[in-house]
């Protein structure tokens, strides 16, 4: 049975076509995101002016710690979920894949709460005596609330050979992050009180804004595909007797080597 969630009026695509199409989407999303990431620095640097070097140092230090939390909470999850969902689909066990989606998303949301709380509470310790870093770290705690769930949903769609949702959501996430970052930096440094620390805090908080938009797009896509998913679930063989814990442990085993 066709595992892709493509339009109902379109003929099924071959594995080769799906692979090429998926690679094209992921490559395009990555290229556009990198281009945006390179361009935004120019106006950001200009508007920060003489405070740029200090602001950039705070920004970079914040993201270094944030990246560690991100690796711990999400590393390997999209690939592991994609592999498991594809395996269940190949077996005709679509219902098991949906169980993974629902319970996995909840588990990753709990992971997000724990990661967010840990970074928020540890901010004074992580700041190592630099009080300016505390609000920077805490602004970066917020995206940790959403990104674990976001990564699992992307992996779920990849398991159906649907790369477009991941690529487009990553692009939208990047656009929203950069727009918020630049708008707030301009409002503070050009039209406001020139508080560079406040500009940095909003620049790092922009990661949360991006995550909201990226997650929102994936939720919309999921709702639109729900009827097709329900049809596949109704056709599920249901011959696989596996508990929720076993499903999640299998995903963890796939993901942990990537950490």
Residue ranges and their predicted role:
Residues 129-153:
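Alpha-helical transmembrane segments of multi-pass membrane proteins
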Residues 164, 175-228:
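Membrane-interface helix-loop junctions in multi-pass transport and translocation proteins
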Residues 60-83, 145, 259:
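Small-residue-rich midsections of specific transmembrane alpha-helices
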Residues 114-134:
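Short membrane-interface helical motifs at transmembrane helix boundaries
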Residues 72-106, 159-164:
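Transmembrane-helix boundary and interhelical linker motifs in polytopic inner-membrane proteins
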Residues 147-169:
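Membrane-interface junctions at transmembrane-helix termini in multi-pass inner-membrane proteins
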Residues 1-39, 99, 237-258:
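N-terminal membrane topogenesis motif
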């Amino acid at each position: 049975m066709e595992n892709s969630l493509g339009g109902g009026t379109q003929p099924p695509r071959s594995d080769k076509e799906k692979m090429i199409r998926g690679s094209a989407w992921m490559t395009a999303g990555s290229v556009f995101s990198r281009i945006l990431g390179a361009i935004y620095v120019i106006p950001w640097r200009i508007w920060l002016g003489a405070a740029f070097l200090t602001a950039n140092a705070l920004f970079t230090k914040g993201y270094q710690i944030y990246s560690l939390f991100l690796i711990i909470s999400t590393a390997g999850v999209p690939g592991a979920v994609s592999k498991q969902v594809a395996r269940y689909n190949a077996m005709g066990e679509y219902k098991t894949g949906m169980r993974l989606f629902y319970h996995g998303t909840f588990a990753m949301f709990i992971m997000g709460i724990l990661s967010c709380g840990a970074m928020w509470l540890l901010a004074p310790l992580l700041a190592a005596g630099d009080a300016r870093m505390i609000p920077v770290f805490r602004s970066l705690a917020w995206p940790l609330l959403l990104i674990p769930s976001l990564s699992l949903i992307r992996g779920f769609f990849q398991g159906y050979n649907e790369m477009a949702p991941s690529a487009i959501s990553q692009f939208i996430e990047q656009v929203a992050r950069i727009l918020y970052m630049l708008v707030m930096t301009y409002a503070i440094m050009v039209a406001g009180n020139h508080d560079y620390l406040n500009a940095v805090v909003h620049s790092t908080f922009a990661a949360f804004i991006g995550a909201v938009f990226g997650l929102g797009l994936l939720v919309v896509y999921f709702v639109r595909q729900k009827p097709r998913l329900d049809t596949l679930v109704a056709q599920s063989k249901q011959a696989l007797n596996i508990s929720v814990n076993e499903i999640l442990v299998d995903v963890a085993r796939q993901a942990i080597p990537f950490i």
